[in-house]
Structure formats: structure tokens, C-alpha cells
Amino acid sequence: MEFAAFADRAEAIESESADTAITEAVTDLFRASGSDLSTLARFVQGRVFPAYESRTLDIGPRLCYEAIARAAGQNVSADDVEQRLADLGEIGAVAASYDLGGQQGLAAFGAGGGGDDALTVAELDDELRNLAAVDGSGSQGTKVDILFGLFSRCSSTEAGYLARLVLSEMRIGVGEGTVRDAAAAAFDVPVEAVERAVQVSNDYGMVAEVARDEGESGLATVTLEIGRPVQAMLAQAGTVAGALEDWDRAAVEWKYDGARVQVHFDGEDARLFSRNMEEVTDPLPEVVETVESTLDAPAILDGEVVAVDDGGDPLPFQEVLRRFRRKHDVAAAREDVAVRLHAFDCLHAAGEDLLDAALETRHDRLESLFPADSDVFSQMWLSDDAEEIESLEAEALAAGQEGIMLKDPTAAYSPGKRGKHWRKRKPDVETLDCVVTGAEWGEGRRANVLGSFELSVRTDDGYATVGNVATGITDEELDDLTERFEPYIRSEDGRDVVLDPAVVFEVGYEEIQASQSYASGYALRFPRFLSVREDKTPDSADSLARVERLAESQ
């Protein structure tokens, strides 16, 4: 398929407002996709790579502006593009506003494609993968060259959607649910079969191809693959009384103040993945050593990595993140902050997928993988007694942990799902994970430092504001945050700064109030900064629907 045809279809999809019409349009796209089906299943969501891959284009907004400016002609600069973005508000509209095709870049296709033929979806996919592979000295210039060549071959409509795709800002109303339903409709297979295959593979493109080529029977053969992470099962807040009322008895585990990790062991080598499915094997060598020296057969485990002091007592969550972020001099970091794995679930063991097994069964398999005296697997207690559970909670808190997890012992493991089968009980006030979409420069001696941050939550078509936070951030943290946000500055107007959504804050608050001052219709009363959620992306931040539920439950 030519990229122009995809861009036209994306434009048509974006013009629809009804979910059914959007799904029908994506269904038609899939039926017409031919050999490009896998790629289009990603592109239509604004993804270049499958969700389980940690690869990125590593293209900041400024590099994209430079490529657009070069393709637009000698009289256009990156600053001009940025100013037009401030006027138009969206990078796709900016790219589409220039006449990019036919500029002097047509002679430069050695870096960005091939000749004056129409750009195809397959060729664009190849070029973007080449761009992602560029590394080392001069890599930014090479990336701009590749983008320049691609933009120079684009019509206005194509350029708009290319810019959105490159900056992960497609936002045409197509989410994972739409792709799931469209794949099922396009190839006449049950939605449940598609969803199940996606749960175990985390690859919508591959699943769509299997649905088309092999049907429902083929989807049933899609299984977990060691080395290919899946989304983590998530918990909602809950109470002991509610859990016992729903399940009669509960599985109780300590809730560790750590970072989620998925362990993949192929029988020889271990690989570790964060909650966002980014590989974190290299920063955590002691966890790798523990797994490789203990396990005998292939396995996929779910767990938490906790930072500990010399006595083995837990350290704050931020200490774990220091290790997760460390890319260089890992040995020194290991000396400064030790980490320990607490595995609490088993998704696969010795060739057998266990997602559909009951939690109680999965935990038995988990224990069987380790020596009886091992402290690697997390203890689990079964109880139907509220007082006993509260006693276990007190023990967890006394040991420096966050609280307890309450789980339905009969429930299967549902990747990516936040539901009633796992419930977290913490004494802390509920927090929100908000996307930072704006900021404000300080005043006086802090004029060159960002001092206040605009908080937003996810909606179906973007983000909606819920407030601003400045409380709880030290001067040192403000300096660090300013440096962190600089690559994501989209535009500035006086002290006001518009930021590309890239960073997630964990925010505490006293109350959620109805408010017309913010786009969400809600405002956080007395918000306070708690931490940067290094383990989360904007796609996994809290949603407006959750804000609504929390507001109703106050």
C-alpha cells in the first residue's frame, strides 16, 4: 500500500466521531492491507514498533522540526516550524501546512528512501527501522537526513501523518480496543480469540496476520514466548471486607515498595523487563545472577525488585529507580544500592503456559522452582479471617513494606487488566499518576527553572488537565526536572510552556473536586509532587475515568 493511501484513510478515520464508524474504517483498512497488515496495525495506533519492543526512534521534537524545515526550503528554520506549532497547536497540521514534496531534498534520497516513486508503507517502515538503528557520533544529523528525505517525498496529507507517527502523536481515535475489534471483524474471528492472542503475544500486527491467514484455530496456537514480555496484571484499591465478601477467602501477599519486573529465563540466560516492557537486564546484574543460578528450566515470572540496605531492610522506591536508570558504571551503582528480587507469580514454567491457571496453582508452581528456604519467591497466605489478614498487614508495615495485596486465589492471570481480582490495600492516601503537559518558568533568581507543572490524565482522544503542582518539589529536583523537560518543550509564550506528553508524575492530593477551570471537569485540591514515575509512560498514566471513579467514591 502506498503511504498516501494510508494517510487518506487515517484522515477519514480522524473525521469520524462514532466508535462504530471508526472500527468499520479500520476494518476496511485491514482488509485492503495485503502484505502491509502487520505494519498498518501498528501505524494506525501511532506505533512504529510492537509494544513489547523497547526500541524507539529516539527522535525529539526539535529534530523533527529540523527535518520539516529542511524539506520546506531554505527560507524556513526549525524555529519557524516551532512558531507555527504554537499557532496551529498540532505537529501534523504544521507539517501539512508546508509544501514539502519536490524541494531540494529530492536529490538526497540516499539517506531517506529511494527515488521519486511514491512512498510505500513497507518502505517507510524500513526507513524508520533504519533510523532507529542509527547510533553513535553524528547520529542526530543522520536521523534528520533520513527524516528530511522522507518528508521531501510526502504530500501535505502524508507529511502530517508522518510527523505524527514519528513523534508518537497519531491520535486519530484508534486504540488497542479498536484494532482488536477491527481485526476480528475483518477476518471473521471471535473478538475473544483476538484478545487472548494479543494478551500472550503483545503484538497486534502478528495477531492480525494470524487471524487473516489461519483463522480462529491459528489464534489458539499463539502462546507466550520467552524474551517477549507481556503487559502486567494490575490491581485496584480495595478493602479486606470487600475481598472476603467477593471471594470468601483471599490470597494475601506483602506489597513491596519496589519496581515491577518480568523475568524471562530460557534455561540458560535471564532477561528482565520493566512494567513498560523496557529491557532492564543490564542495570540489575544481581537479579540476573540469582535467576540464572537458581532456576533449572525455562520460566516467565512476575515480581518486584526492591532496594535494600546492608541489613536487608527495604529502602525507598526512588533508590530502586536509581538502579533502573543506570546505564553506565553499573558495578559502582551496585555497590551503592543493592537490590533483591521478590517473585510473586509464575506465568510459564518448563514449557507450560500458566495464564489460565488459578493463582493458587501458579504460586505452587512458583514455589516449586526455588529451594524451600529461598527468599526469592514471595510468601502467600490464604485466609478467610479479617483479623488474621489485618495482622498480616501490620507485619508487612512493620517490615517497612507498603502494605498488602489481596488476590482472588481462583483467578487467572489477565495481562494488562486492572480488575477486581487483585486489590491493593495501603494505609496511604490514594495517588494519581498524571502526565505533565505544561509548565511555567519561575521568577527572579529561578527565572531559568521550571517551577510549576500542568497535570493531565488520559482521555479517549488525548489528555485533559486536572490541575497544577508546585508543592513538594525541592530546588534540586526543580533543576533536574528542568533539564529533563527541555527536549520536550513544544512552545513557549512568556512564562507559559507547552510540553509534549512524555513524563509521568505521581501526585498526592487531599480531594478531587468538580471544576470548570480544567478540561477534565475536575481539579485536585492541594496537589503535591511525590515522584517521577520512571516505570510509566503517558499511555499507562491514570485516565479520566479513574478520576471520575475516585471523585464519586470520596
UniProtKB/Swiss-Prot annotation:
<dbReference type="GO" id="GO:0071897">
    <property type="term" value="P:DNA biosynthetic process"/>
</dbReference>
<dbReference type="Pfam" id="PF04675">
    <property type="entry name" value="DNA_ligase_A_N"/>
</dbReference>
<feature type="binding site">
    <location>
        <position position="260"/>
    </location>
    <ligand>
        <name>ATP</name>
    </ligand>
</feature>
<dbReference type="GO" id="GO:0006273">
    <property type="term" value="P:lagging strand elongation"/>
</dbReference>
<dbReference type="Pfam" id="PF01068">
    <property type="entry name" value="DNA_ligase_A_M"/>
</dbReference>
<dbReference type="InterPro" id="IPR016059">
    <property type="entry name" value="DNA_ligase_ATP-dep_CS"/>
</dbReference>
<dbReference type="GO" id="GO:0003910">
    <property type="term" value="F:DNA ligase (ATP) activity"/>
</dbReference>
<protein>
    <recommendedName>
        <fullName>DNA ligase</fullName>
        <ecNumber>6.5.1.1</ecNumber>
    </recommendedName>
</protein>
<keyword id="KW-0460">Magnesium</keyword>
<dbReference type="InterPro" id="IPR012310">
    <property type="entry name" value="DNA_ligase_ATP-dep_cent"/>
</dbReference>
<feature type="active site" description="N6-AMP-lysine intermediate">
    <location>
        <position position="255"/>
    </location>
</feature>
<dbReference type="InterPro" id="IPR012309">
    <property type="entry name" value="DNA_ligase_ATP-dep_C"/>
</dbReference>
<dbReference type="GO" id="GO:0006310">
    <property type="term" value="P:DNA recombination"/>
</dbReference>
<keyword id="KW-0479">Metal-binding</keyword>
<dbReference type="InterPro" id="IPR050191">
    <property type="entry name" value="ATP-dep_DNA_ligase"/>
</dbReference>
<dbReference type="GO" id="GO:0006281">
    <property type="term" value="P:DNA repair"/>
</dbReference>
<dbReference type="InterPro" id="IPR054890">
    <property type="entry name" value="LigA_Halo"/>
</dbReference>
<dbReference type="InterPro" id="IPR012308">
    <property type="entry name" value="DNA_ligase_ATP-dep_N"/>
</dbReference>
<dbReference type="GO" id="GO:0046872">
    <property type="term" value="F:metal ion binding"/>
</dbReference>
<dbReference type="InterPro" id="IPR022865">
    <property type="entry name" value="DNA_ligae_ATP-dep_bac/arc"/>
</dbReference>
<dbReference type="Pfam" id="PF04679">
    <property type="entry name" value="DNA_ligase_A_C"/>
</dbReference>
<keyword id="KW-0131">Cell cycle</keyword>
<keyword id="KW-0067">ATP-binding</keyword>
<dbReference type="InterPro" id="IPR012340">
    <property type="entry name" value="NA-bd_OB-fold"/>
</dbReference>
<comment type="similarity">
    <text>Belongs to the ATP-dependent DNA ligase family.</text>
</comment>
<keyword id="KW-0227">DNA damage</keyword>
<feature type="binding site">
    <location>
        <position position="424"/>
    </location>
    <ligand>
        <name>ATP</name>
    </ligand>
</feature>
<feature type="binding site">
    <location>
        <position position="275"/>
    </location>
    <ligand>
        <name>ATP</name>
    </ligand>
</feature>
<dbReference type="GO" id="GO:0003677">
    <property type="term" value="F:DNA binding"/>
</dbReference>
<keyword id="KW-0436">Ligase</keyword>
<keyword id="KW-0234">DNA repair</keyword>
<comment type="function">
    <text>DNA ligase that seals nicks in double-stranded DNA during DNA replication, DNA recombination and DNA repair.</text>
</comment>
<feature type="binding site">
    <location>
        <position position="344"/>
    </location>
    <ligand>
        <name>ATP</name>
    </ligand>
</feature>
<keyword id="KW-0132">Cell division</keyword>
<feature type="binding site">
    <location>
        <position position="253"/>
    </location>
    <ligand>
        <name>ATP</name>
    </ligand>
</feature>
<feature type="binding site">
    <location>
        <position position="418"/>
    </location>
    <ligand>
        <name>ATP</name>
    </ligand>
</feature>
<keyword id="KW-0547">Nucleotide-binding</keyword>
<feature type="binding site">
    <location>
        <position position="304"/>
    </location>
    <ligand>
        <name>ATP</name>
    </ligand>
</feature>
<keyword id="KW-0235">DNA replication</keyword>
<keyword id="KW-0233">DNA recombination</keyword>
<dbReference type="InterPro" id="IPR000977">
    <property type="entry name" value="DNA_ligase_ATP-dep"/>
</dbReference>
<dbReference type="GO" id="GO:0051301">
    <property type="term" value="P:cell division"/>
</dbReference>
